[in-house]
C-alpha cells in the first residue's frame, strides 16, 4: 500500500468518506510538537544514564519551538501538490524540492537561541556552523538527505537537521488537501517528504489502536498496519523485544526477512510517549538489537551515524 495526497478540489464525496474512516496521514500539529518533545526529553533525562544528552536534545527542541514562532512561513503549496500528485511523488520530496534561504535563516536563529546555553565542544560546533558559507550549508544539507554521513560530522548533523526539520514541518503543516491510501509502493518512507521514520506509535484517542510511523524530518505521521514489517511489509518472521516485560511502553519490532527493526511506542501503556524522545532514551534496546544481528531502519534526528558507521 502507498499513500498519495489528493488536492482538495479533486476529492469526490466517496473519497472524503473513505479518508475519514482511517486517516492514512496525520499532518504535523506544530502548536504542540516541540514543547511536548522538550518536556518529555527532560522528564526521561531524570532517570536515564544518557541524561546529559537528553537534556542537550531538549535544548534544541525548545529552541525549535522559539524559532518556529519567530519565523513563520507563508507558502502556497497548491500547485506543488497537484504536480506531485500527477507524478506520483511526495509533494515535499527531499531529493526534488528546491530549498530556499528560509531554512538557513532558521538555522542561524537556532544557533543564536542555543549559544547562551552551550559550552565546550558543543559551543565550538555551533560557532563553526555560524561561520559556514551558504554553499557549505547547502552541501551539508544535501549530504544528509543523501545519507552521506561521511560528509557531515555527527556533532554538526543534529543542528543542521533541526533547521531542515523545522522548515519541512512548517511546509507540511501548510499542505492543502487530504491523503488517500492506494495499492502500490511500500510505506517505509514518508509520503510527504520521502524521509525515514524515527519510530512508530500505537495511538490512543480518535486513532485508538492504530500504528503510525513518525517522520524524522517533517513530523508527519502515516498509517501502517500492525504486525507487518514497516520496512519490507512481510509478516511471517516478526518478533517483539523489550527491556522490561510484555507491558512495556517501548518495544522493537524485528523482521527476520529483511534483518531490520523499528521501535514501537504504545500510548495506552504510557500516554506521554513521544516518537523522538522515547526512541532516543531507549538506546540500550538498540544495543541489544545490534547484538542480535538486526540493523536499524530509522534515524533519530538527534543521533546520526558517524563516518564509517
From Swiss-Prot:
SUPFAM superfamilies: FdhE-like (SSF144020)
Tree of life domain: Bacteria
Signal sequence region: none
Pfam families referenced in this protein's UniProt entry, alphabetically: FdhE_C, FdhE_central, FdhE_N
Keyword Isomerase: no
Alphabetical GO biological process terms: protein maturation
Localization (cell): Cytoplasm
One GO location term (cellular component): cytosol
InterPro entries cross-referenced by the UniProt entry: FdhE-like_sf, FdhE_C, FdhE_central, FdhE_N, Formate_DH_accessory
Gene Ontology molecular function: ferric iron binding
Chain segments annotated as coiled-coil in the UniProt record: none
Keywords, in A-Z order: Cytoplasm
Role: Necessary for formate dehydrogenase activity.
Recorded family membership: Belongs to the FdhE family.
Protein name: Protein FdhE
Organism: Salmonella arizonae (strain ATCC BAA-731 / CDC346-86 / RSK2980)
Taxonomic lineage of the native organism: Bacteria, Pseudomonadati, Pseudomonadota, Gammaproteobacteria, Enterobacterales
Gene name in the database record: fdhE
